[in-house]
Amino acid sequence: MAPEIFVKFKCASRDIKLLWASVFLRLLSYGLTNQVLTLFLNAINMTEDKIGLFMSLTLAGDVICSYILTWYADSWGRRRVLVYGCAMMLLSGLVFSFSENFTLLLVFAIFGVISPSSDEVGPFKSIEEAMIAHLSPHNARPEIYAIHALVGTIGSALGAIICGIFVDLLKRTGLAATDLQCYKLVFLLYAFFAFCKMVIMLLLSDATELDGHYEHTDCNEETAEPLDVNDETAPLMRQATHPEERSNKLSKETVSVLMKLLVIFMVDSLGSGFMTSGWMVYYYSKQFLMGSLALGTLFFITQLVMASSTIPSSIIARCFGPVRATLLVQIPSGIFSILIPMAKNYLPLSILFLNLHFATTAMDVTPRQILLTNIIKPRDLTKVMGVVNIGKTFARCVGPIFTGILANNNYLWLCYIISGSLVITADLILACMFLGVDAKIKKQMNRH
């Protein structure tokens, strides 16, 4: 499987490689700000409950903007939407670098692109994943999505350690007199990487605008069929012959599947929102009094651990099918999350549980992408991925409010338990709704 990964990497089209570079820079940028956002807000005298509200409003704004941008991305132009997103990243970074005004920061956090954690925000993820689906055949998707997840996670890891080293260097050299000045310079670096990402988006070819209305030609692949839970099928890429297919409406079959997906992903994201990586940084900073370099090193290691799990995730998906693969990795991840606060007085054990959590938490990314791209009709894929990611972000909006309140009352540790419990619940719902399609998707993935 590993050699096959390298073959897919080497043989990938120029556009897919550019998309990999894009997700690398984006997650690197989010990794930078993830290390300092909660500490920055605390440094400008925001209370913990107010920080939680700030994060929730940021995510709520992302829901609204992402909904509009992803829903109309196909008609407005995917590349144009991605370039706009990069511009908003750049502006947000500049505002956070030069302002301490709560209202101004909140406006640019809501309408710009600032990640309250190292997770995805903005319209990028759903549009890029839809592009990859339309640029790659079914039998190559597990490896291509695994590489996509891998480079993103590596970017996030590098962002964490770069931030730690950068802040430590600023303090040692005297270039920044206070922690707050260091945090502002980190946001300036974020703006620079946003500009680099914008350049990459401008280099994408016209092929990234193609979708399910066009034939996918691959001399080694038979025409693949998307699966739905009712066993209905449709060609992977075909010419649209009915005006309804060119409209912005989803088919009835797609809406039925989408409702089930939303329940699963929103419960999962509700759990994730209770303890984002931004709050994890805050937890270790306050609970164990860790400095910037130590925090950067810790989350660099956790992100590397998470990155190393993305390749095995494609192997597990091929062997067991996407649904069983998700269950095998996500239930242990939830359990490890619950165990983290049990070691709140013993740092080495806490770090062990944290790394075990990160080792399993991202292993469901590839299986879930495979599930989505196999049960959704190609012409609906961009919109469905957009709605799913928006639903996930909306669900994540709820958690930070309660996290802030709990943190303000010295119960931040409880959020680990709530988070893990909700993730396990989402996995059980997934098993009930989609376990039956595993065998067919597995067969389609392993077709040569």
Curated annotation (Swiss-Prot):
Residues 1-50, 115-146, 206-260, 309-333, 408-416 are extracellular. Keywords: ATP-binding, Membrane, Nucleotide-binding, Transmembrane, Transmembrane helix. It comes from the Eukaryota. GO terms for cellular component: fungal-type vacuole membrane. The chain crosses the membrane at residues 51-71, 94-114, 147-167, 185-205, 261-281, 288-308, 334-354, 387-407, 417-437. GO terms for molecular function: ATP binding; transmembrane transporter activity. ATP binds at residues 386-393. InterPro entries: MFS, MFS_dom, MFS_trans_sf. Residues 72-93, 168-184, 282-287, 355-386, 438-448 are cytoplasmic. It holds the Pfam family MFS_1. This is Uncharacterized membrane protein YJR124C.
